[in-house]
Amino acid sequence: MQPQLSRPQTASNQVRKAVSGPWSGNAVHKAEKYFITSAKRDRDGKLQIELVPASGRRKLSPTPEMIRRLIDGEIEIYILTTQPDIAIDMNKEIIDMENRYVIDFDKRGVKWTMREIPVFYHEGKGLCVELHNKIYTLDQFFK
């Protein structure tokens, strides 16, 4: 069985060395999970991102070391779709994503819908997200 990338649309210029990811088994045990909890602009208009691990113990910033760990697959970073700092109209996007990703695992009507958006490193652009095969830098994605 061939290993598959965690995001099926991953292009060759999207850097990710590890092949396990959020849609392959229980990803919580494969990599440290972080969430972007705040994305505010400073006085100069530069985006200031705040990360919190899934354990919720401390607040961090995306350092070059964390980006290297993301590329190596040691950590995974997500944005919750309820994040108030998102600039894109997520109400429309989530409806489309729910229609696309709803899976009835046990055939009893119990369904899972995507509520976390994975963040990845795109060579030349930096940290990015992908919605409907369109790549947004975090600078474009947040207000």
From Swiss-Prot:
TM annotation in the entry: none
Region (Disordered): 1-24
The keyword Electron transport appears for this protein: yes
Record's compositionally biased regions (Polar residues): 1-15
Signal peptide coordinates: none
One record GO biological process: photosynthesis
Subunit structure: Component of the P840 reaction center.
Protein name: P840 reaction center 17 kDa protein
Native organism: Chlorobaculum tepidum (strain ATCC 49652 / DSM 12025 / NBRC 103806 / TLS) (Chlorobium tepidum)
